[in-house]
Every structure is written in structure tokens, then in C-alpha cells.
A protein has these predicted regions:
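Short amphipathic alpha-helical interface segments
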Residues: 2-28, 80-103
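Low-complexity, interaction-prone regions
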Residues: 10, 122-129
Length: 169
């Protein structure tokens, strides 16, 4: 599962409303992420624009929703928020340093790197705040990542010690 709290809440809301909600200003970019994955569809119902989730998907979501899914959503949310913060501060991080920092901050080893990368790739696409590149991860506002990487190499300074003071639930 690549869901974080924001995306989980939207799907939960749609599932709680029999698979359909009015399209109330959900950005086109965010809706496209769900549409590309064939989770949600746009339509018109009684003359009103709606987002629709097929009954089959609603049923699967409802049957899977529980403490295990909530735990995964919480973990994913933590990873995504930490990634946004780290890349806002550092700009660019190679995968080795990034993974080490994430494990240090969360106190958990990343057991499945493929799942980890899928979650972060999906979040990067959805939120547009960071991207996976040949060098690792970068903040989307960085135009010249080579320059940042070279600066990191020249500075020979350790990464600033972050803590996890935010409350994301």
C-alpha cells in the first residue's frame, strides 16, 4: 500500500459515501494520480461533478481497512513527511545517506527497499514536492542538483541532526 493519511482519508470518505462524492475542488493533479491507477473516476451524477470509486474497489478497501492498514498508513505518512522535511533542508540526498537518515529518524530498519521506493515515488508524483532522480531524491524546487551535490562533497560537513518533533496524526 502506498497510501498516506491524506490519500487514505479521501478514499475512506468515498467508501463511507457508497463510492461517490461531489468533486469539491480536488486538484486535477491529485485526481489524475487516482485516475491513472484506476482507483477513482470522474463523472456527472444528477447534474453534479463527482468522483466515483467502483463498488468492487470500495468492497476491497472496506475489507482491508483495519489496524494493519492504519499502521501502514501511519508509517507511510511518517516517511513522506520526513522526506519532505529532509529535502526541503538538504535539497538533494543520495539514496545511501537518505536511507540511513530515515532509519535513524524513525528508529526502524527499512526492510523492503522496493516498497519504500514505491511509496516515496507515489508521494512525489502526488504532492510534487520531491522527485527520485539518478542521484537519489531531490526537492522539486532544485534546478541544478549537480551544484548541490558538489557543494555537499566540498563542504565535508555532516548532515544537520534532525529530530522528529512533528505530530502527523
Amino acid at each position: 500500500y502506498t497510501l498516506d493519511q491524506t490519500r487514505y482519508d479521501l478514499i475512506r470518505r468515498i467508501a463511507d459515501n457508497s463510492g461517490m462524492i461531489p468533486d469539491e475542488g480536488i486538484s486535477l493533479e491529485n485526481a489524475e494520480e487516482y485516475i491513472r491507477r484506476s482507483i477513482l473516476f470522474t463523472g456527472i451524477h444528477n447534474g453534479e461533478k463527482v468522483l466515483y470509486m467502483p463498488d468492487e474497489l470500495v468492497n476491497i478497501f472496506v475489507s482491508e481497512d483495519g489496524s494493519e492498514l492504519k499502521s501502514i498508513v501511519d508509517r507511510n505518512t511518517e516517511w513522506i513527511l520526513l522526506t519532505q522535511g529532509l529535502l526541503y533542508y538538504y535539497g538533494v540526498m543520495n539514496l545511501t545517506d537518505y536511507t540511513k537518515k530515515m532509519e535513524e529518524l524513525t528508529g526502524r530498519k527499512i526492510a523492503d527497499s522496493s516498497e519504500f521506493m514505491n511509496i516515496l515515488y507515489s508521494a512525489g508524483e502526488f504532492y510534487g514536492q520531491f522527485k527520485l532522480t539518478l542521484h537519489g531524491f531531490k526537492n522539486s524546487k532544485i534546478l541544478d542538483e549537480e551544484k548541490i551535490i558538489n557543494y555537499h562533497r566540498q563542504a565535508k560537513v555532516e548532515f544537520y541532526p534532525f529530530t522528529t518533533l512533528f505530530q502527523y496524526t
